[in-house]
Amino acid sequence: MVSIKGYQIKEQLYNGSRTLVYRAIQENEQKPVVIKILQNAYPSFNELLQFRNQYTIAKNLNIPGIIRPYSLESLQNSYALVMEDFGGISLHEYMQMNDNLSLQKLLSIVVQVSDILHNLHQNRVIHKDIKPANILINPETQQVKLIDFSIASLLPKESQEIKNPETLEGTLAYLSPEQTGRMNRGIDYRADFYALGITFYELLTGELPFKSNDAMELLHCHIAK
């Protein structure tokens, strides 16, 4: 298990293809925290840039509906992102544990995320990767928070959108048509609500609206269907 100075690692919460997440105690204040690190021992410049980006954007947002970042620690050739631990699990995991949620509870979740997105957009931030894995819910309080601002964008004051993207960013199954880079249109706050719509569809039906193992076919579905 990873060792980080000043923190006592308690358990591993997540082991993904790109990141590892741990629950820990900050030793000085005896405060519970969550720590996210990169899987790659020698991350690329772009991976490091995205890691710094999620800290830089989130730390300047005074919004209760996002996971608060505490610090970005140096860790060998990489970083460790230290965040608040509010006792949440991913919405993806929560739905697997509760496959018969009432419509009222589902609507409560979606309304909370909608309010968080509204606050984000009031702060000129577009998340660009809304999906069940990036929405945390506390099983006891039902409070919802957003995580992972690694590809989020802060809009300049003079603009309401990001120019037509040259590279594809986001998760294919939840990607807005504008994020495909094939629409000759900029990206604005509606991209996040498009992804939230797909997320709500998945919560209601238990499946995604577009199902394909072919990336190009999925892109076409988002654009044309």
Q: Where is each model-derived feature located?
A:
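A short, aromatic-enriched beta-strand patch in the conserved N-lobe beta-sheet
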Residues: 71-72
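Conserved short submotifs of the Hanks-type protein kinase catalytic core
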Residues: 76-90, 94
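Activation segment signature within eukaryotic-like protein kinase domains
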Residues: 109-110
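AlphaC helix of the eukaryotic protein kinase fold
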Residues: 42-60
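Structural helix C-cap motif within protein kinase domains
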Residues: 205-208
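Protein kinase catalytic-loop region centered on the HRD/HxD motif
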Residues: 115-125
